[in-house]
Amino acid sequence: MKPYISIVIPTLNEQDNMHKLLEGIHSVIKDYRYEVIIVDGHSRDHTVKFARQMGATVIYDDKGKGSALRKGLAAAKGKIIISMDADLSHRPNELKLLIAGIEAGYDVCMGSRFLTGGGSDDMPLTRIIGNKIFVAIVNILYGSHYTDMCYGYRSFARGVSRKLSLEEDGFGIETEISIKAQKKHLRALEVPSYEKLRASGEGKLRSLGDGAIILRTILKNL
């Protein structure tokens, strides 16, 4: 029997992306039993209405991406739990690759834009350099071999989020997951992922401020 899948998606004012995203998810994993959990930061548009119309479960958290992800992971019922963004930058056709990584026995499976077959339409030079610097620092300090650090398209075996004891409320959450997976000797796999441009709406990432948050996350977990 195929595993039950939970997909956790933090949202804030993503109404224009909801239908295409949820239709894309369904088209790829319609042969699985699955749930979609929208963790909404009190959107001012019709994100919640559209998500519910498409059959998603909606819960609320407005403390930041990390807090929303932690709340969604805690609510998920699936044997395999997947985190993805709402802006269509994460391609639904890669879902089965993330599922396969957990089915193969890994605890965490992480999309990487820097493996062969991966890439990005939305990574200016400053972000490329920043990501590579953060990856190098983490690999040196923690003895890991990651290629990507700040990318949220990931899958988890059930129970892994409790083992990780995540604390980050903001954009440091992906870095915290990577570091704690290494520190707790979890089996982690990177798979190629191609990041598309945000389809609609306003991005929430702020390179300088969020870079400082990521650096703080790296250092505080030493």
What are these regions (language model features)?
Residues 1-24:
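N-proximal low-complexity "stem/linker" segments adjacent to membrane-targeting elements
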Residues 4-6, 35, 176:
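Cell-envelope/extracellular polymer assembly enzymes that use nucleotide-activated donors
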Residues 23-33:
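Short, acidic, metal-binding catalytic loop of nucleotide-sugar glycosyltransferases
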Residues 40-48:
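A conserved acidic beta->alpha catalytic loop
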Residues 61-63, 67-75, 92-171, 196-219:
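Acceptor/aglycone-binding surface of glycosyltransferases and processive sugar-polymer synthases
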Residues 81:
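Short aromatic/hydrophobic "clamp" motif used to bind/position activated sugar donors
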Residues 85-89:
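The conserved acidic donor/metal-binding loop of glycosyltransferases
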Residues 160-164, 170-187:
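A short, conserved alpha-helix in the catalytic core of glycosyltransferases
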